[in-house]
Amino acid sequence: DKGFGFITPADGSKDVFVHFSAIQSNDFKTLDEGQKVEFSIENGAK
């Protein structure tokens, strides 16, 4: 709903911020709580 959220890595490391524009999908750009995803971490401006 907010256009952003956080991903919890499987290795238990610190949560990662994710903006909806970073989601690559052919459908709606949404993630559900508990959904498993693959991701690459990039450093950027806050």
Swiss-Prot record:
Pfam families on file: CSD
GO MF, one annotated term: DNA binding
Keyword Transcription: yes
Cellular location(s): Cytoplasm
Record's keyword terms, sorted: Activator, Cytoplasm, DNA-binding, Stress response, Transcription, Transcription regulation
Primary localisation category: cytoplasm
Domain CSD: start-end pairs: 1-46
Induction / repression: In response to low temperature.
Gene3D superfamilies: Nucleic acid-binding proteins
PROSITE patterns documented for this protein: CSD_1 (PS00352), CSD_2 (PS51857)
Quaternary structure annotation from Swiss-Prot or TrEMBL: Homodimer.
This protein's name: Major cold shock protein
Name of the encoding gene: cspA
